[in-house]
UniProtKB/Swiss-Prot annotation:
The gene is chlL-A. Pathway: Porphyrin-containing compound metabolism; chlorophyll biosynthesis (light-independent). Keywords: 4Fe-4S, ATP-binding, Chlorophyll biosynthesis, Chloroplast, Iron, Iron-sulfur, Magnesium, Metal-binding, Nucleotide-binding, Oxidoreductase, Photosynthesis, Plastid. One of its GO terms (biological process) is light-independent chlorophyll biosynthetic process. The lineage of its organism: Eukaryota, Viridiplantae, Streptophyta, Coleochaetophyceae, Coleochaetales. The keyword Nucleotide-binding applies. It is an enzyme of class 1 (oxidoreductase). SUPFAM superfamilies: P-loop containing nucleoside triphosphate hydrolases (SSF52540). Homodimer. Protochlorophyllide reductase is composed of three subunits; ChlL, ChlN and ChlB. This is Light-independent protochlorophyllide reductase iron-sulfur ATP-binding protein. [4Fe-4S] cluster binds at C95, C129. The keyword Iron-sulfur applies.
Amino acid sequence: MKIAVYGKGGIGKSTTSCNISIALARRGKRVLQIGCDPKHDSTFTLTGFLIPTIIDTLQSKDYHYEDVWPEDVIYKGYGGVDCVEAGGPPAGAGCGGYVVGETVKLLKELNAFYEYDVILFDVLGDVVCGGFAAPLNYADYCIIITDNGFDALFAANRIAASVREKARTHPLRLAGLVGNRTSKRDLIDKYVEACPMPVLEVLPLIEDIRVSRVKGKTLFEMAESQESLNYVCDFYLNIADQILSCPEGVVPKEVPDRELFSLLSDFYLNPTLSEKENTLSPSSLDFMMV
């Protein structure tokens, strides 16, 4: 099974991807996570350091694939998850899609691409140009990471459009949305009502998820010394269980941009009476007292 993870830049794709990879490994699966970002930091919380990229390794070998060994590019991460970083072209030059293609080509040359139960592509930001949409060519499922905000859901809608386009020629389906670090899901629910798709999970708004990235650890590793985090790990295990059940998935029909803009902005500009009441804080009530 191959999964491509997309979402708005900075939404927490890599942190979420790493924890999903660990959850899949905890379910007894052999997992490979491939970082598809020029920053090459996708697998940082799994390995604890920035591993060399495929492109760096190929350049050092003058692109002689026969001189590259699996241990040159595949690094063992926490929980037994194998890690690869594709890297990227120089800034302002080249194509990220080419880099992804070269990565898959090399892994096939090394007979590694088909050795895993699950391969997870963690893809750069919300860029859905032909280049960075390349992982969708190999994926069985796409997962979109979002939060309960306007920008993230707008990006999710554009990614959904890419999934629909790729599904014309590939056996690709959208597994669903994952809400990351959000205390509410009302705007998410409003979006999936307009663009039907599963919501796999909504992760709680806790600081430890963000801090784990800085520490270079997954929530599962942090939970070894902080038992209070075990309940957070259960969220990722639930996502893993849903993925491993081979869900039917959907081919989404994205909402037209102007219609979505109106839908999401109206949610903020014209909230219902109950929503207005919920937004009143104790401090604002103090000012209203006579």
